[in-house]
Each structure stands twice: as C-alpha cells, then as structure tokens.
Amino acid sequence: MKTSRLPIAIQQAVMRRLREKLAQANLKLGRNYPEPKLSYTQRGTSAGTAWLESYEIRLNPVLLLENSEAFIEEVVPHELAHLLVWKHFGRVAPHGKEWKWMMENVLGVPARRTHQFELQSVRRNTFPYRCKCQEHQLTVRRHNRVVRGEAVYRCVHCGEQLVAK
C-alpha cells in the first residue's frame, strides 16, 4: 500500500469507515464478506475504483487529502458497495438497481454515481471545445481520439457535436 503522503490519521479514518460499513453490510446480509485490499493509487479525476477480481479498492490520494470528510463519508462506501454487489449478485450493471439497493438499504448512504469534488489539482491539460450552449474541456485522451477520427463527443445538454475552439 503506497501511502507516503497521506497523514496516518486520514488513513485510519478511511479504514474505520471501511470496516464500519463492511460490518454493517455483513450484519444486514447475514454474510461474512472479507475486508478488501485498499490502496491509494488511483490517479486522475476518479475518486476511486473497485477492482472486482482482485477484491481491491483504489482511492485517489490527492482528492482524499483535499476533501477528506466528504471523501471518507461517500467514496469509501461507494466503492465498497461495488465489491459487495459483485460478491452478492455477481456481475451486474455498475450503478444499477443492485448497487443502489446496496448503497441505500444496506450501507445507509445516498446512492450518488459521481462526486462533486473540485478537480483543478488533478486535471491534466485540457482542450477547449464548444457546442451551441457552452464551452467544454476535453481531456488529452478524448482530444486525441477526436483528432484521429476515432470519436465524436456531444453535449449532454443540447446534444450538439463538440467542436474544437
């Protein structure tokens, strides 16, 4: 577990939350699911990811440091729910009805698919694109896909194709 820049108090708070929610789930489900492996290796704008086959949760240390309380309250149970759903139901839609049920009825946490953390410190170079209603910032990866003709992106609000400025 690479955790060199994270204060021990934050790491302990993450483990407390993980263990608390896992115990709650095991009690409500009548199971004894094991504690998942935890690492602080997630990069980019994702707060965390759940790796099903390796039964591992990867958390973003930068976003954790910048948003400790909300991160621990929301992201840790969010990723744990993915692992529990996989153990309990098998392969299902990532944020489907089983995940929502696990979040709300078992873990007692609002089922939100995305975080609302400020991303300036973790966002790499972006490229400005426009539609008819607003400006968008595309990541290097998405920009390169557009340049190579491999992808077309549309605005989720107006539906218009995004065009480089």
UniProtKB/Swiss-Prot annotation:
Record: residues binding Zn(2+): 78, 82
Active site annotation, chain numbering: 79
PROSITE patterns, per the entry: ZINC_PROTEASE
GO CC annotations on file: cytoplasm
Pfam family, one: SprT-like
SMART domains on file: SprT (SM00731)
Subcellular location: Cytoplasm
Cofactor (UniProt): Zn(2+)
Protein origin, superkingdom: Bacteria
Cofactor binding remark: Binds 1 zinc ion.
Record InterPro entries: SprT-like_domain, SprT_Zn_ribbon, Uncharacterised_SprT
Signal peptide residue numbers: none
Residue ranges of domain SprT-like in the record: 20-163
Principal cellular location given in the protein's record: cytoplasm
Keywords, sorted A to Z: Cytoplasm, Metal-binding, Zinc
Family the entry assigns: Belongs to the SprT family.
Functional description taken from the UniProt entry: Involved in bolA gene expression at the stationary phase.
Name used for this protein in its record: Protein SprT
Lineage of origin: Bacteria, Pseudomonadati, Pseudomonadota, Gammaproteobacteria, Enterobacterales
